[in-house]
Regions:
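RNase H-like, metal-dependent nuclease domains and their acidic two-metal-ion catalytic environment used
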Residues: 1-43, 47, 51, 55, ...
């Protein structure tokens, strides 16, 4: 499925969660898309992704179909939690039939992670499009 998407669209960036089972997927994708990057979802990475997404959303730079309840549920499933050590904060989503592990939200946040911080809602940077099928 990933290879078909790269053949159909002009894919510029692929980031794969390599924390667990994704390591195998990452190795397979690297064979046909060498620029793919692996990402370990540490507490620091999750925090960076969430804070960046909040910044983009608050600035009015994220638009999506209001009828896309799957994406909405996915974002709403992510909650701030104390880490196992009790000394830090992380973000996580419990498994649910509606939102999974918030995979759509994490995918969207990965795309937003490459959005420039200085971009503005009035066009300070080029427009990016993320399509989820």
């Amino acid at each position: 499925a990933i290879k078909k998407i790269t053949l159909r669209y002009n894919v510029a960036n692929i980031v794969i969660d390599t924390t667990g089972l994704g390591q195998g997927v990452f190795q397979l994708v690297k064979q046909f898309f060498p620029a793919a990057r692996g990402l370990q979802y540490t507490a620091e990475v999750k925090t960076r992704l969430v804070l960046k997404a909040q910044s983009v959303i608050r600035a009015g730079r994220l638009e999506f179909d209001a009828g896309d309840v799957d994406l909405q549920r996915s974002f709403m499933a992510i909650k701030r939690e104390v880490t196992g050590s009790g000394r830090g904060v992380t973000y996580a989503a419990g498994r649910s039939s509606e939102a999974g592990h918030a995979d759509l939200a994490w995918a969207c946040m990965n795309a937003l992670d490459i959005e420039p911080l200085e971009a503005t809602a009035t066009g300070g940077a080029s427009r990016s499009i993320l399509e989820i099928n």
